Amino acid sequence: MNPTSSNLLLLGIGGSGAAMVRGILRAYGPGVRALILDTDAKSGGSTGDIPFVLLGGNRLAGQGTGGQPTSARAAFQDNPALLDAELEGIRTVVVVTSLGGGTGGGATGELLKHLHSLGIVTLLFATMPFAFEGAERQRNAKTAAGPIEQHADVSVFLPLDDLVADAQTDIMGDALQRAVDTMATGVTLLWRILERPGYIRLDAERLRNILMGCGRAHFATATARGPNRASALLASLAEMPLLKRDESSPPVRSILIGVLAGDDLRLSEIAEISSGLSAAFGEKATIELGTVNDEATFSGRLSTVVLLFEESATSTRRGLDKDAGKPQSMGERSLAGNSRFRHTDKSTWNDEDLDIPTYIRRNLTLDR
């Protein structure tokens, strides 16, 4: 596959995002269309193997933000169109980053806002700081999450404490690498499902339709071997902190399940995984399923990728017209959330929607 032919893009923002992209490419191999954005010129690497866009070159001289999110936000706002040449033909972007620091925390919301303005659907994976990193870094991450959730179609926030919960080492460098590897493995499995679909297809265009305006999600992967591998896989998922839920958790609206195996994949295994996840996370939730049969990669093992999409207010705030795939106008967004008029016809005259205030309809600026 020619990576430049795909309408699916992997985009890492900030130093951590760049590291995640490189980890995913190592795990997947050739065939992933990727891009790195950062305020630090060193993230581009010396080989030029991955397209790189430097943010805020005139403002920051390629030296990074020094951990200041406001500097990263301003750097992106200087020239949002800087990356548009790399977005030609792109319909869906998977964004990976880390929150709590400078570039990831400050520029990711602006990036997602820009992608949304172009009609590009976005799935975001963002790591959240360790608890021991302190209140300020935690606060910065939560502050960054607000605009991210507003502009991303789907947001997956991954606490680093949960990513390393099953690590077999206490060495910090090894634990951090474990976190990157865990996230890279999950995104890599998702990429295989999209780009190498099996008998039950889940391709990039179907994913785009599933993701559009969904809001917050939870994400996990698991792998098992042996005669009872489907049961073992479900047991592993049940113990994962990334999928932990309690009485305060919003209901699960839908579950995306990717099943990856060799030629020995059985229908009974697919049924067991699907019914097991449905029973665990909500029998009323809709199921979206895709499979990959890849004997060379998955011989003897069974892997799964799970995305749980929650019922939340976030999805109703996303101003995306699902029929047209384009951003809605301000007036359309305001009316969409008004339940009084949800099931009534629009009032139109000369092709103008009279339910939308005149100053919005005609783009008039009001004196204050």
Predicted regions and their residues:
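Tubulin/FtsZ superfamily GTPase core signature
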Residues: 1-368
